[in-house]
Amino acid sequence: MMRRSKRGFTLVELIVVIAIIGVLAAIVVPTALHFVNEGKIEAAESDCSTILRTLEINIGRLAVGTSYTLDGAQVAQILNTYLGGDPAEETYVSIVTADNVSYTLSVTSPVQKDGVDISYQRTYTPQSILTVVPCVVVFRNGTWA
């Protein structure tokens, strides 16, 4: 009598392999997603810090004693000219005047950390005669406006 050779896998073997793959996926996928989210948060924090530094440097270049008006158009021009890279869509910069002497720059990203939008702000007292017009500038479709 001739014996037939077995070919393929049994149903039990297939179920065991599928179960092992499922367990591995349950462990690996959440960990990978965590690292992706952490990367987005770090990128948004870096973008906010870079935007503040870019504005600080370029506003600080104004000659002492000169008169200058800083408004939304000027902020957009500075960011479009000197800022490399693209922040998250809908990142925005706002300028608020505290008094006639100082102003506060605030950069906010739509990326959230612990359920709150990432936001950096600094208050400045300019050395030049600076007139600050409160404004909001938003990054949309690859440009600041």
Regions found by a protein language model. Give the residues of each.
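N-terminal alpha-helical signal peptides/signal-anchor transmembrane segments
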Residues: D47-T66
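Extracellular/periplasmic head regions of type IV pilus-like filament subunits
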Residues: A63-C135, R140-A145
